[in-house]
């Protein structure tokens, strides 16, 4: 399983800019498990059309990934 997004070579700069935040090698194993699925999906999305909606989709996916990671880290009340 890759630890960084690996889409096609020609990415719009805004797509590449967001895609970098899906890397997960720096995370501890229990967070890599959560993040890797989002990285895989982000790579698939980035391999599609290069337009503003792709960037929007990746930003929203990034927001979901961040929430999923925080859910694992949640200490409870």
Where are these regions (language model features)?
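Charged, amphipathic alpha-helical regulatory modules used
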Residues: 69-70
